[in-house]
């Protein structure tokens, strides 16, 4: 029963509570219950994203938000036909991975990043199949501030090596490739190396995201409106940044999660994970574990850090439900 004091408080302050200003992000998920891949799953997920635009932040510039994106399954037919135009025949679905990569606009830095990625692929015994420029709508209205930060968007296609038999092993190799390439690129201390980022690298899923408004994601990324873009799942997120500034890499979804909330123990969690790096061991990752450090970075958002840790545990063999 509502007390007299509570009624008086409501009369004076209304239903608004400043305590709720900590987890305003919007997220949604749609899936075919039988796992059937269809294009309308993608369009329905994008519609959900449009319908939760009120959960994301918009600046004084109405074309600048905190970021939005979608995670879907690999659209094999789309990628297969597009890569065939370059003379590249992709292996069977599940036998190759796709890395979605944000690259610097500055040519020399971009070339250095691509070369380090190719070196990492070769070093891990996997096969570089080719690169693809991600088609985007350059005519879409975009905030000048967002346009200034807009990366070059490319996909790298990676075939499994002879030592990789099952898809889980390929996922682990892609994980190691992504981590080692990123570490090597940052070690170069390029002027624009901070503009390099890998939203996803997997044989199962791909992430399309950016410093976009909710209704811009499906317009900006032309792949998403292509009828060949089919998936049985669609995970979408519209960001309301609370503890980090809006940036292209910090948009959700991440590789494993999309999150509505704020993890206030993020610094402690990061430090604990950093401390554990010296004593961790994994029979699944074996010697590759040493190539993955650091697991996370101090200048990321709370969700990015959580995603890094969840990814490590999953790659080490823990069920995601555990």
Question: Model segments located where?
Answer:
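Conserved short alpha-helical segments that host acidic/polar catalytic motifs at enzyme active sites
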Residues: 1-322
């Amino acid at each position: 029963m509502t007390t007299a004091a509570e009624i008086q408080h409501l009369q004076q302050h209304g239903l608004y509570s400043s305590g709720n200003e900590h987890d305003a992000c919007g997220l949604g998920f749609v899936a075919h219950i039988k796992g059937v891949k269809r294009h309308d799953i993608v369009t329905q997920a994008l519609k959900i994203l449009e319908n939760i635009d009120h959960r994301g932040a918009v600046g004084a510039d109405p074309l600048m938000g905190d970021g939005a994106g979608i995670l879907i399954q690999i659209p094999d037919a789309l990628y297969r036909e597009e890569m065939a135009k370059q003379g590249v025949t992709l292996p069977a679905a599940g036998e190759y991975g796709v890395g979605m990569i944000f690259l610097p606009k500055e040519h020399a830095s971009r070339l250095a990043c691509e070369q380090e990625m190719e070196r990492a692929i070769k070093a891990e015994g996997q096969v570089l199949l080719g690169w693809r420029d991600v088609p985007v709508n350059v005519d879409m209205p975009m905030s000048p501030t967002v346009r200034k930060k807009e990366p070059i968007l490319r996909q790298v296609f990676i075939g499994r090596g002879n030592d990789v038999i099952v898809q889980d092993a390929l996922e682990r190799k892609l994980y190691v490739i992504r981590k080692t390439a990123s570490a090597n690129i940052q070690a170069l201390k390029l002027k624009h190396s901070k503009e390099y980022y890998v939203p996803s690298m997997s044989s199962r899923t791909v992430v399309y995201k950016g410093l976009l408004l909710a209704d811009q994601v499906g317009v900006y990324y032309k792949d998403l409106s292509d009828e060949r873009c089919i998936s049985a799942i669609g995970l979408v997120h519209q960001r309301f940044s609370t503890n980090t500034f809006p940036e292209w890499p910090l948009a959700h979804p991440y590789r494993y999660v999309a999150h509505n909330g704020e993890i206030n123990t993020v610094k402690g969690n990061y430090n604990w994970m950093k401390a554990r790096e010296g004593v961790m061991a994994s029979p699944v990752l074996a010697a590759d574990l040493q190539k993955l450090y650091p697991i996370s970075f101090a200048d990321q958002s709370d969700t990015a850090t959580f995603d890094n840790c969840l990814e490590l545990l999953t790659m080490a063999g823990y069920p995601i439900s555990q």
